[in-house]
Amino acid sequence: MKKRVVLFSLLTLALSGVARADDAAIKQTLNRLGLQSAEVKDSPIGGMKTVLTENGVLYITEDGKHLLQGPLYDVSGKTPVNVTNHILNERLDALKDQMIVYKAPQEKHVITVFTDITCGYCHKLHEQMKDYNALGITVRYLAYPRQGMNSQAAKDMQSIWCVADRNKAFDAAMKGDDVSPATCKTDIGAHYQLGVLFGVQGTPAIVLDDGTVVPGYQPPKEMMAMLDAHKASLKSGG
């Protein structure tokens, strides 16, 4: 029994050494490209790793010599599936406590919306919140100031996310009320950065539960039909 434990320990050390060696080559390449803060994760492609950067998702060979820019699609099913966004769902889950949520009484679908309080179609979506909720659609908001993190919209949304009643503050802002300055540990910069990784180009940007991103506004009934069809597609294998 002791021999087995020793052999297992040696094997574990050997494998971890290989993993460190692979990551070392990758990190050396990333450092050379000015991507020191990038996060390296496993990839669904053999011999490659996923790299999460401030500007998007990349894929790099384990020897650090070849680099591809995402997204990556699985085309083995009936329709292409964005594998990259499946990976990003982990980061989305980590922000659950920071989301401003409008929960449906009889929930059938959950969508996460990257929003901007200065966006016309974001206002239109929010004005119909009762209709979305009545159909069984729960809406979760993350902040995505289209003009960047130095914009006034970013400062206002940061304040909204820092008050005790975020829903009330968000409702007021969407009605055109002035936003009172507030500060806290919550950083909507993390929301914005995740939006960049998801490839968000404008708002509203809707993320489905499997990581699929649907750009733009959709009326409640059309949204419900799309969500039902998407769910049925996933059940049938894509």
UniProtKB/Swiss-Prot annotation:
PROSITE patterns: THIOREDOXIN_1, THIOREDOXIN_2. InterPro entries: DiS-bond_Isoase_DsbC/G (IPR033954), DiS-bond_isomerase_DsbC/G_N (IPR018950), DiS-bond_isomerase_DsbC/G_N_sf (IPR009094), Thiol:disulfide_interchange (IPR051470), Thioredoxin-like_fold (IPR012336), Thioredoxin-like_sf (IPR036249), Thioredoxin_CS (IPR017937), Thioredoxin_domain (IPR013766). One of its GO terms (cellular component) is periplasmic space. The keyword Signal applies. Keywords: Disulfide bond, Periplasm, Redox-active center, Signal. It holds the Pfam family Thioredoxin_2. Disulfide bonds join 119-122. Residues 61-232 form the Thioredoxin domain. Residues 1-21 form the signal peptide. It is found in: Periplasm. GO terms for molecular function: disulfide oxidoreductase activity. The keyword Transmembrane does not apply. Homodimer. Required for disulfide bond formation in some periplasmic proteins. Acts by transferring its disulfide bond to other proteins and is reduced in the process. DsbC is reoxidized by a yet uncharacterized protein. Also acts as a disulfide isomerase. Belongs to the thioredoxin family. DsbC subfamily. This is Thiol:disulfide interchange protein DsbC. The gene is dsbC.
